[in-house]
Structure formats: structure tokens, C-alpha cells
UniProtKB/Swiss-Prot annotation:
Keywords: Glycoprotein, Membrane, Transmembrane, Transmembrane helix, Transport
Region (Disordered): 1-55
GN (gene name): FPY5
The organism of origin for this protein: Fusarium mangiferae (Mango malformation disease fungus)
Compartments reported by the entry: Membrane
Biased composition (Polar residues): 20-30, 46-55
Name used for this protein in its record: MFS-type transporter FPY5
GO cellular component term of the entry, any: plasma membrane
TM spans (from-to): 94-114, 120-140, 147-167, 183-203, 214-234, 241-261, 286-306, 316-336, 360-380, 402-422, 424-444, 463-483, 498-518, 562-582
Length: 597
């Protein structure tokens, strides 16, 4: 038996829930629970006693039908094909692109924003307010999609994100902008969470690796493009377009989503969906206590990580008490989820306790957490190093990160082929990604402290990019192989949330390392006032004498290398976490079923 949920390992390897079964029988009957069939879809037939489904015809042609587990065995999953699949994929990619851009695009637009709104002392909150809600709502959206449906929750997320993006662009002072950014992050969180959850529900299992590679490539591309686009916008037009361009993009994504899938996704049309939505029984399923506690715990820890060493010293009462309170709330959340999981009631726990006993889930969570550290550190700090140490512009710094930008999506595409076409066990590609990531980070940390750019630096970026590409896509590919369908959404949400949390902690660690290194070493040749000025803004380095400027930039190079050396330890930890995923016969992506006769 598998150590996951009591399912036979063979079932998980070859035929996970929802695996399509081909047949040549034809019928135009639709299940009562499914409502009407949509054109350009492939339906999942109702399971019979011999585990073979009845077949649905589609315009006198044979179609694939699927039999699998769901919360209600009478529901039939409808896979998308044709224009509906292309429209849905476009909607997911576009919305994911926009929401992910917003996590990094303000990094190069920040100076222009605070100068225009006269709020330099509140600049950090433009980033923090987005991150606290972006991180806190990931698992909440995942669980609510189980209850209220993916389409409704994603439309809600896109609407919130788009409306408050426009509000951010129209802001005339810092306080409204910070508040609107928090709501924008709430919408962006739902987009990120649901775009990964919907992939295994919209295509058959054998196509999942291909489509998750598309989503992972979009995520990585947008993460790296953010600073480049932010710099280009602020250099050639007003900073307000950093937010305004989400308006038409968000509207287009919402329209594509609205017309490509039914509200009862992935189970086809149903005239009972909105009636069920209004029922008290459905609302009783929501774990309001777990949602509130997990959200508060996430917000507090992100606040402490973002503001520690910036607005408040790390040892201050504000930061220490925030960390302690967050820890207490996380303990309370764990205790509540365990209690709720043991109850035989209607309310569904945010994080089912059975997943804690699943070593594969724990392995994926640990791997995602540790991978988040070097991933975000590389995305943010490599462009900063080019700007601060090598004196390049924001756009030029972005261009110099192209090896990282281009190789990551390439790795996800290769990974999709390896896992889905060649059926290489995802564990192997995860180990490959972790190894490349570790080698790349290690080599980058060995760069000489100099204001000149070593050509080898681009090679190190490429190696890191390949590692990140393999890692980030494989983690999501493995989730459907280690959990049942009823736990798929919450596990996906947990993996994405803990990866974002790891990245946020990684950035906080890097910031602390840089500040401490500069404070410790710069006092040897700068006054206390000069040290404070260069920590306030790296642009102030230009106010120093020529000789001191060069020495200061070399000092920053030392600090950036130290950051990567520490990130190397987390990369190694991500490889060690794979021990929890090891098994005698590593599971593979399901093979495409052969058509009968």
C-alpha cells in the first residue's frame, strides 16, 4: 500500500483519479448531475460497478471519457478541448502573468512612485501591503474553490485584482495606494492559487505535465520581467501605467474565462449551481475559524519579515512580539485543524490532518519552502547587484538577467516532455533541478568582488535558471500523484503558499545580511552619516568621492556574494528534503490510454 492515503501505489502510478478511458460506444445521454454538455469538451462518464463508464457521443465522433474519484461519485468531470481549452489556457496564463508581475514590477518603479506622492518614509509599505495579502489568501482561495467552484472564485479574484489595480493607478497619496495594493494582492493571490489548481481539472492526467509547464513558464517569465517592465514604464511614461495596464488585461482574462468554462467546472453545465450556492449547507462547509487564524498568522509573519531591519530594528519589541504572536497563531491553527479533522461534521478543515501523515506531501512542502529562498533571492538581488555594483540602469540590469529569464522556461518545457512524453519519474527531474540550482547558486556566490562584470556570471545565471525551471514545475506535477482528488486543491494551495513564504523569508534574510555587512565594514572608511545615506538609497553612493565610490561598490559586491552563500545552504536543504519522496518504484505521470479496437 502507498503511504499517501491508503490507495494502492499502482493506482497512483498508472491511473490516478480522473484517468480517461477510451471506448467506441456512443450515446447522446448526459448524466442528470452534469446538466448540458458543452461543445469542445470531453466528459467523464459515471462510474459503474465494473469501473467502466457509460459513454457520451459528440457529433457522431468517438470521445475520451474518464472515470475517477471525486467528492461525489455521481459527478462527471468534463475535460476541455478545442477552442475552449485554448481560451481557458489563455485566460489562466494572462491573469497569472499580470498578478505575478505585480510582485516585482514596483521594485524599479518605487522611486518614481514615492517621489510623485511624497511618501519616501512609507515606500516599503507599497511592497509589503501586496505581499501580506498575496501570501495570506493562497490556501484560503484553494479551499473555497472546493466549496464554491473554481470559476466563481477565479472570476472574483480577477475582478478584485483588476478593479484595485486601476484604483492604485488613480491614487493621489500614499495611504490610499497602500490600502489598494493590499486589495490588489488579495486578488492576485486567488489568481496564482487557482491557475495551478485548474490545470489538472481541465485536461486528462497524461496532459497535465505539459500544461503545468506552460503555467510554470508564465510564472517564471513574469517574475523576471517585472523589474524590466517597471523600469521601462517609469523611464518612458508615468508610473501609473505600472497599474493601469492590468485593466484591459484583467478584463480580457475575465471574458475568456467567462465564456470558456461553466460555473460548475469541472463537471459541465448545471442549472442547480447558483441554487446550491445560496444554500446554508454549503456555507456550513466553510472553516471560518481556520481561515481567520491562518490569514492573521500569515499577515503577521510577512509584516515582521518585511519591516524588520527597515522600519524597526530586528530586536525591537514590535518585531519580536509580531513573530511571537504569529507563532502562537500558527500553533492554534494546527491544533484547530487537527480537532476539526477528527470531528465527523459538515465543516471542512482548511488543511486536512491526513495530509500531515502523508510523507510525500510533507516532502513537497519542505522542498517548495527551501526552493523559495534562492529563487526569490536570485530574482530580486541579481538585478540589484548589476545596478548597485556595476552601475547599470534598471532596464540594462534586466537584460543582463536574460540567461536566468530564458533558461527557466526552457527547463520547464523540457521537463514537461520528460515527464509526460518520456514518462521519466518526476522525482528524478526534481533531483536534477535541485542539483543544478545548488551548483548555480554556489558558483554565483564565488564571484570576485569587483565593479567589472565577469562573463562567467551569465553562465552561472543559466545554470540557476535551469534548476529553478525544473524544480518549480516538477513540484506541482507531483501533487496529483500523491493525493486524492478531494485534497488536490488544498495541497496545491499549500505548496504555492509555503513557496511564497519561503521566498519572502529568503528576501528578509538577504536584506538583513546586506545591511549588517555594510554597517560592519563601511564604518572602516565612511562616517556614520554616510553609512546611513548609502543604506537609505544606493543612489547616494554617487555623492561620495570617486575612490570611496569604488570601495563602497566592492563592499556591496561582498554583501551580495554573502547572500548567495547563505542561499546555498537552503538549496542543499531542498535536495535533502527529497528523501521524503524516495520510494522503490518512483511514481510516474499516467500514460495516455490506448484506444480500444
Amino acid at each position: 500500500m502507498s503511504e499517501t492515503t491508503g490507495l494502492p501505489l499502482k493506482h497512483l502510478q498508472g491511473s490516478p483519479p480522473g484517468t480517461p478511458v477510451n471506448t467506441n460506444n456512443e450515446s447522446n445521454e448526459a448524466s442528470p448531475d452534469d446538466g448540458c454538455r458543452l461543445p469542445d469538451t470531453v466528459t467523464e462518464a459515471e462510474a459503474s460497478s465494473d469501473n467502466h463508464g457509460s459513454v457520451l457521443g459528440d457529433n457522431n465522433r468517438n470521445v475520451e471519457v474518464a472515470v475517477g474519484a471525486s467528492d461525489n461519485a455521481t459527478k462527471q468531470k468534463v475535460y476541455h478541448t478545442g477552442w475552449r481549452l485554448h481560451a481557458l489556457t489563455s485566460a489562466l496564463c494572462l491573469s497569472l502573468l499580470l498578478s505575478t508581475l505585480e510582485t516585482t514590477i514596483v521594485s524599479t518603479a518605487l522611486v518614481s512612485i514615492v517621489d510623485a506622492l511624497h511618501g519616501f518614509n512609507m515606500a516599503g509599505w507599497i511592497v509589503t501591503s501586496y505581499l501580506v495579502t498575496y501570501t495570506g489568501f493562497l490556501i484560503i482561495y484553494s479551499k473555497l474553490s472546493d466549496i464554491f467552484g473554481c470559476k466563481l472564485m477565479l472570476l472574483l479574484a480577477i475582478t478584485i485584482f483588476t478593479v484595485f489595480s486601476m484604483a492604485c493607478g488613480a491614487s493621489d497619496s500614499m495611504v490610499p495606494l497602500i490600502v489598494f495594493r493590499a486589495f490588489q494582492g488579495m486578488g492576485g493571490s486567488g489568481i496564482y492559487s487557482l491557475s495551478t489548481i485548474m490545470v489538472p481539472l481541465m485536461v486528462p492526467p497524461e496532459k497535465y505535465a505539459t500544461y503545468i509547464s506552460i503555467m510554470s513558464s508564465t510564472f517564471i517569465l513574469s517574475s523576471v520581467l517585472g523589474p524590466i517592465l517597471g523600469g521601462a514604464i517609469t523611464d518612458h511614461t508615468t508610473w501609473r501605467w505600472v497599474f493601469y495596464f492590468n485593466g484591459p488585461g484583467g478584463a480580457l482574462a475575465a471574458v475568456l474565462l467567462a465564456f470558456s468554462v461553466p460555473f460548475n467546472f469541472p463537471y459541465g453545465e448545471s442549472d442547480r449551481f447558483f441554487h446550491s450556492l445560496a444554500s446554508k449547507q454549503m456555507w456550513k462547509r466553510v472553516d471560518f475559524v481556520g481561515m481567520t487564524v491562518s490569514l492573521a498568522a500569515s499577515i503577521l509573519i510577512i509584516f515582521a519579515l518585511e519591516q524588520g531591519g527597515v522600519a524597526y530594528p530586528w530586536g525591537s519589541g514590535a518585531i519580536v512580539s509580531t513573530f511571537v504572536l504569529s507563532g502562537v497563531l500558527w500553533i492554534a491553527f494546527i491544533a484547530w485543524e487537527r480537532l476539526l479533522s477528527k470531528r465527523d461534521g459538515v465543516r471542512e478543515p482548511m488543511f486536512p490532518w491526513s495530509l500531515v501523515h502523508n510523507r510525500f506531501v510533507m516532502g513537497l512542502l519542505l522542498n517548495g519552502f527551501f526552493t523559495g529562498f534562492p529563487f526569490m533571492a536570485a530574482l530580486i538581488n541579481i538585478p540589484q547587484r548589476f545596478q548597485t555594483v556595476n552601475m547599470t540602469s534598471a532596464i540594462n540590469a534586466g537584460i543582463r538577467t536574460l540567461p536566468l529569464l530564458l533558461l527557466s522556461p526552457l527547463a520547464t518545457a523540457i521537463n514537461g516532455i520528460l515527464v509526460s512524453k518520456l514518462r521519466v519519474p518526476p522525482l528524478y527531474t526534481l533531483f536534477l533541478g535541485g542539483s543544478l540550482q545548488t551548483i548555480g547558486v554556489g558558483l554565483y556566490s564565488s564571484l570576485k568582488s569587483s565593479t567589472s562584470i565577469a562573463s562567467a556570471q551569465y553562465g552561472y545565471e543559466a545554470i540557476m535558471g535551469l534548476g529553478f525551471g525544473f524544480n518549480l514545475s516538477t513540484i506541482l506535477m507531483m501533487v496529483p500523484l500523491v493525493v486524492t482528488e478531494k485534497d488536490l486543491a488544498v495541497t496545491m494551495g499549500s505548496v504555492t503558499q509555503i513557496r511564497v513564504l519561503g521566498g519572502t523569508i529568503g528576501l528578509a534574510v538577504c536584506s538583513a545580511l546586506l545591511i549588517n555587512h555594510i554597517k560592519r565594514e563601511a564604518v572602516k572608511f565612511l562616517t556614520a552619516e554616510q553609512v546611513a545615506q548609502i543604506l537609505l538609497s544606493s543612489e547616494n553612493i554617487g555623492m561620495l568621492s570617486i575612490e570611496t565610490q569604488s570601495r563602497t561598490r566592492v563592499l556591496y559586491a561582498d554583501a551580495y556574494s554573502e547572500q548567495m552563500r547563505v542561499m546555498l545552504y537552503f538549496s542543499i536543504a531542498s535536495i535533502l528534503s527529497l528523501v521524503l519522496l524516495v520510494e522503490r518504484q518512483p511514481r510516474k505521470a499516467p500514460a495516455k490510454p490506448e484506444r480500444a479496437g
